[in-house]
UniProtKB/Swiss-Prot annotation:
Keywords: Cell wall, Secreted. It comes from Arabidopsis thaliana. It is found in: Secreted, Cell wall. This is 60 kDa cell wall protein. The lineage of its organism: Eukaryota, Viridiplantae, Streptophyta, Embryophyta, Tracheophyta. Its main location: secreted.
Length: 7
């Protein structure tokens, strides 16, 4: 994703 998903 373009956003930080915590991975």
């Amino acid at each position: 994703k373009g956003v930080n998903d915590g991975t």
